[in-house]
């Protein structure tokens, strides 16, 4: 079905992002592709679905064929009829506001009649328990719900191959269980799967083979049996996540401290409200915020920072009320979709921009001591780049980075800010073990007596490393009259 022989991929005059790739994939097979962030996983997927050639001006050497035809020369609409894609950022999939219309949109573009569309929808709902997502506003979905909708759309397209780029990166364990249940059913229907992934625990029973990419090359290849025989120490040396499902063991939330949410009421999706009362947080701690997809975690962060106006709120610091404006000025936030937080033409410029924002507040006698400040900033920026493994990327455009590299860059810009309250929304989504541990180390270094850090995450292994206490937001989600069951 898919044949790749001695294939290399380059963009412009830069170094190849893929080198001498040779692999094959048959109908009903599952190939897992893993490796450090920036190792070429997304580039391989973009080569297979044709985006590297048709949209990114990539230049290929060697052969990449699907059912005997060269993907480089096939029109993009022909590729789309055979190969479906699930991207790291599910927002790039959507063309409609309504979720049901979005699912139908794929089939409408293929020219299917109404009866065939109905049959496919019925078949979909037998595989995917996603009735609760139908008829919803896409913009009201959580990141994980959007990803599930993307996978469902790919199934409806009726393609022979589905390529997935970090499909579990924003999913909670319940949503991963849905994905884990659905993928074998796709295999049974003869659909081939190529999955680029860091979380491996839910794929061990599904995979037929696994390849490990390193700097754009296939460094190692394993059958399922060979991969399962590797020790945890070997996996750690390779920078891979554990095969075992992680379990969170951190202290429960103690509800004490200087920052208090005396009352907070936020409508966050159809018929539901997030309600907190007398919830306190202490300086010098890192709070993990957990809960299933769609329970209001991102809404809580936006309300806490002052970016979202709740229906009702009173937040105090040592007993004194903090207005929304005050919270904005004292907060730094890394959002789930970091693409909306990157503005400049290079990694280094992005960090300098964050530093200049801090300088607006750091004045001496009404003036900024520019030379000394710039030298200090350059040292701080270099330290951050080294700590996050981005030193070699400092001249690159932020939009050319991998998803994990963008996450680390956004986190670095956040840490350069002069803030008391730091909020991180899924900071390790789509991130390998090595870089996850880098971020955990860096966040623990930020624990100071004048700072509180909040981390929303489904990454249990990361929370195990970094969180001092955890708040389960499921406790505070309240359904109003008429809410869906």
Question: Residue ranges of each PLM-predicted region?
Answer:
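Helix-to-loop junction immediately C-terminal to a conserved catalytic motif
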Residues: 49, 305
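Conserved ABC transporter NBD signature motif
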Residues: 57-69, 313-327
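Conserved ABC ATPase "signature" region
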Residues: 115-133, 369-393
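Conserved ABC ATPase signature
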Residues: 137-141, 145, 397-401
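ABC ATPase C-loop
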Residues: 154-155, 415
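Catalytic Walker B motif of ABC-type/P-loop ATPase nucleotide-binding domains
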Residues: 162-165, 422-425
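ABC-family nucleotide-binding domains
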Residues: 172, 432
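H-loop/switch region of ABC-family ATPase nucleotide-binding domains
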Residues: 197-198, 457-458
